Curated annotation (Swiss-Prot):
Residues 437-447 are annotated as: Sufficient to suppress UBE2S activity. Residues 337-358 are annotated as: Disordered. Zn(2+) 2 binds at residues 406, 409, 414, 419. Regulator of APC activity during mitotic and meiotic cell cycle. During mitotic cell cycle plays a role as both substrate and inhibitor of APC-FZR1 complex. During G1 phase, plays a role as substrate of APC-FZR1 complex E3 ligase. Then switches as an inhibitor of APC-FZR1 complex during S and G2 leading to cell-cycle commitment. Residues 261-409 are annotated as: Requires for efficient binding to CDC20. It comes from Homo sapiens. The modification Phosphoserine is found at residues 94, 102. The lineage of its organism: Eukaryota, Metazoa, Chordata, Craniata, Vertebrata. Zn(2+) 1 binds at residues 378, 381, 396, 401. This is F-box only protein 5.
């Protein structure tokens, strides 16, 4: 029997493993010998190797250098039993520094880092655009004054510059005011009013400097008029002054909660004193409801106490000179006080008895005198009598006498009639001329 090579239905690709001849059976078909069995096993291994190699090369991934040493000495389970050439290729790639990782490991790593990679790509794309980078820079608080672009000159005419300035100023001012009105969109919420105003003005000037390098003061006034920058709350204007009205300054700035805290610490009498300082302080007191209620109650209580303890609450206080109605008020007041003074004198005379002298009697009456009154001796009993020089009236204070007379005519006191009908009081001695007059000088010359 002649020997011929084994013929299979599927001829595998050429491999490094050589096929050995096989014997032919009695039926005319070749008997699979040991070499043929080895060939078939090699074929299956080769096919598996080709499949696995292609799958691995389709999913290559570079690993960090720290993991190279660990992966060089490691042979994956799917390469066991494969051909020597594939194992050599695997070892060669691992020595270069780009080891092959299992497809399962590659799939797990890509799934775990997929979200992170997308975020990085999104951030990188946003940072690549110059417009968004400039917007990100302007959102931070830089110390740029806004005048750095004034050196840029443009060849535009004055008419074009004016029209472009108006359009650009309207857009920039509207965007700045939108940032002011919507605090959620404004990045720096904790800016002081001065820094806030500085940022808006500088950004507006920086945008308009390319069109017109000149500073337009009308534009600044319009920014101040449109935007609510709270510049009235700026502190430091009164620094260095000796006297500062703190309450008035707080009232002008609208800090009513601070004023309410201050007024709550004051007592009712202190609130009365606050109202007497100035009209502004009284307005501050009237603006606070709680403090004003306490103040009004204190005023009512003080007035009631004054009316209760004042001996002359029914009339006005006595003064030296009054209007023509003073005589009527005097007569009304004297009738009410006449009985009280007489009872006091009688009680004092009974207590002291014989030791009560004339001097003590006059001194006791003198304690009850008013500002425009004086003491005189009664024309009937020589007892102390009160004398009013404005009314020309004297009243005896002795209980047994009580004579009320006119000092001009020495008659009973008359309020409506004149003293012309009665006899006038004649002086007991003639009064000489006043010193320094012509008559006194003549008398001196005669002497």
């Amino acid at each position: 029997m002649s020997r011929r090579p084994c013929s299979c239905a599927l001829r595998p690709p050429r491999c490094s493993c050589s096929a050995s001849p096989s014997a032919v059976t009695a039926a005319g078909r070749p008997r699979p010998s040991d070499s043929c069995k080895e060939e078939s096993s090699t074929l299956s291994v080769k096919m598996k190797c080709d499949f696995n190699c292609n799958h691995v090369h389709s999913g290559l991934k570079l690993v960090k250098p720290d993991d190279i040493g660990r992966l060089v000495s490691y042979t994956p389970a799917y390469l066991e039993g494969s051909c020597k050439d594939c194992i050599k290729d695997y070892e060669r790639l691992s020595c270069i520094g780009s080891p092959i990782v299992s497809p399962r490991i590659v799939q797990l790593e890509t799934e775990s880092k997929r979200l992170h990679n997308k975020e990085n790509q999104h951030v990188q794309q946003t940072l690549n655009s110059t417009n968004e980078i400039e917007a990100l820079e302007t959102s931070r608080l830089y110390e740029d004054s806004g005048y750095s672009s004034f050196s840029l000159q443009s060849g535009l005419s004055e008419h074009e510059e004016g029209s472009l300035l108006e359009e650009n100023f309207g857009d920039s001012l509207q965007s700045c005011l939108l940032q002011i009105q919507s605090p959620d969109q404004y990045p720096n919420k904790n800016l002081l009013p001065v820094l806030h105003f500085e940022k808006v003005v500088c950004s507006t000037l920086k945008k308009n400097a390319k069109r017109n390098p000149k500073v337009d003061r009308e534009m600044l006034k319009e920014i101040i008029a449109r935007g609510n920058f709270r510049l009235q709350n700026i502190i430091g204007r009164k620094m260095g002054l000796e006297c500062v009205d703190i309450l008035s300054e707080l009232f002008r700035r609208g800090l009513r909660h601070v004023l309410a805290t201050i007024l709550a610490q004051l007592s009712d009498m202190d609130l009365i004193n606050v109202s007497k300082v100035s009209t502004t302080w009284k307005k501050i007191l009237e603006d606070d409801k709680g403090a004003f209620q306490l103040y009004s109650k204190a005023i009512q209580r003080v007035t009631e106490n004054n009316n209760k303890f004042s001996p002359h609450a029914s009339t006005r206080e006595y003064v030296m000179f009054r209007t023509p109605l003073a005589s009527v008020q005097k007569s009304a007041a004297q009738t009410s006080l006449k009985k009280d003074a007489q009872t006091k004198l009688s009680n004092q005379g009974d207590q002291k008895g014989s030791t009560y002298s004339r001097h003590n009697e006059f001194s006791e009456v003198a304690k009850t005198l008013k500002k425009n009154e004086s003491l005189k001796a009664c024309i009937r009993c020589n007892s102390p009598a009160k004398y009013d020089c404005y009314l020309q009236r004297a009243t005896c204070k002795r209980e047994g006498c009580g004579f009320d007379y006119c000092t001009k005519c020495l008659c009973n006191y008359h309020t409506t009639k004149d003293c012309s009908d009665g006899k006038l009081l004649k002086a007991s001695c003639k009064i000489g001329p006043l010193p320094g007059t012509k008559k006194s000088k003549k008398n001196l010359r005669r002497l």
